[in-house]
């Protein structure tokens, strides 16, 4: 009898152990598996949490919107539990991140890692409430945005006139308008078709997106700005459903916690830097022309886009915040981490 009881307890323990291993996190995003985010961060991150949980926690990754919907719906999908974790661009849901979008203002960010650390710290200080319902794993900005043009080069601010250019966000729209272009908003997956059909004359995206969108095959000219500041950028968020996180046992929560935060944000930003180098090389490999805008012309662009900054400060202030103080703090954090 005692042997039967012992056997039963052992079987129950084995069943409990097996059940404990069945934590499978659904991770969704909007780019194909060849993209930098998928291959250089999401897959390694998932491998890391699986190893650190000793196989008790794994990921099932759904790239290219395989769970359905469109990129702007990813944030709702993770909040509603359709996905457990998502990567998305905050600018795809205008108005939901009014404070943290400060980093998308013209000529705000510098290097990949420094900007990522600044974004994480700023959100900790001033914008954590924008992430209600989700657990932040990483916040960063993608690399410097480059203008990729179909048929003609762009060298001065006057060349923007009459051009239809894909913009990354509402602040990107405003910047392009200030420079004289006609902005066309769309998620990254729509860029290829829009370029090939002539819906847009150019697209603003970082270099790392180029291979996944075939932008180097659909354009002939690429424009970078000198001076170490990004023309504009997009704030990226890698977040987990809060209830799903709360349901984990303490030891698995610790695995997620150990793989979240400022330095994880810097890690993914560094991978985007590698991706940028690869995208730039792909364009050069096709014989495309890369133009760097000199400092005196960049100053003209910066002066022309200053009203975008002023308008953002006024908008945020009208909602009860100190817009000037928030802007200055974001600048301060970027400069602080750029010095380190």
Give, region by region, the residue ranges found by the protein language model.
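N-terminal secretory/targeting leader peptides
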Residues: 21-114, 129-340
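Bacterial N-terminal signal peptides
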Residues: 4-14
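Sec/Tat signal peptide C-region and signal peptidase I cleavage site
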Residues: 16-20
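Signature of the catalytic double-stranded beta-helix
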Residues: 117-125, 129-130
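Intrinsically disordered, low-complexity segments
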Residues: 14-15, 51
